[in-house]
């Protein structure tokens, strides 16, 4: 893992370099796409981005949990959660990148 976090500004810069829009237009484009995704999720719609992932809101029922320190049972309120499910295409890309990185890091045995 590289430890780098990709920000909105990074995405806008990438759009600027690859698409040729101005920096301002690139930032506006990134903001618009993120806003549209967020608005759809808030409305309870599923957002499916082919070859990337699916974002979905799910309702969780009330349930009984347990305090790990005391063992005491505590009720957990019903709530809505957002899930992110990576597509098989993305999962494959991640696996290939991991395998490639492992091969590069593997120490070479010197030949006698």
From Swiss-Prot:
Alphabetized GO MF terms: DNA binding; structural constituent of chromatin
Taxonomic source organism: Rhizobium etli (strain ATCC 51251 / DSM 11541 / JCM 21823 / NBRC 15573 / CFN 42)
InterPro entries found in the cross-reference section: Hist_DNA-bd, Histone-like_DNA-bd_CS, IHF-like_DNA-bd_dom_sf, IHF_alpha
Keyword Transcription regulation recorded: yes
NCBIfam families per record: himA, PRK00285.1
Record has Transcription regulation as a keyword: yes
One GO BP annotation of this record: positive regulation of metabolic process
Description of how the protein assembles with itself and partners: Heterodimer of an alpha and a beta chain.
Protein family (similarity comment): Belongs to the bacterial histone-like protein family.
Gene for this chain: ihfA
One Pfam family, short name: Bac_DNA_binding
Function: This protein is one of the two subunits of integration host factor, a specific DNA-binding protein that functions in genetic recombination as well as in transcriptional and translational control.
Stored PANTHER family: DNA-BINDING PROTEIN HU, INTEGRATION HOST FACTOR SUBUNIT ALPHA
Domain of life where this protein originates: Bacteria
GO cellular component terms attached to this protein's record: cytosol
Record keywords, A-Z: DNA recombination, DNA-binding, Transcription, Transcription regulation, Translation regulation
Protein name: Integration host factor subunit alpha
């Amino acid at each position: 893992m590289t430890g780098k976090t990709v920000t909105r500004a990074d995405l806008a810069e990438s759009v600027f370099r690859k698409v040729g829009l101005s920096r301002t237009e690139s930032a506006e484009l990134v903001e618009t796409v993120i806003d549209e995704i967020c608005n759809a999720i808030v409305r309870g719609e599923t957002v499916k981005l082919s070859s990337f992932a699916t974002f979905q809101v799910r309702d969780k029922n009330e349930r009984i949990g347990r305090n790990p320190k005391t063992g005491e049972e505590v009720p957990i309120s019903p709530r809505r959660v957002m899930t992110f499910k990576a597509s098989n295409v993305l999962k494959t890309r991640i696996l290939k990148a991991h395998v490639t990185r492992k091969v590069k890091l593997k120490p070479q045995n010197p030949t006698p």
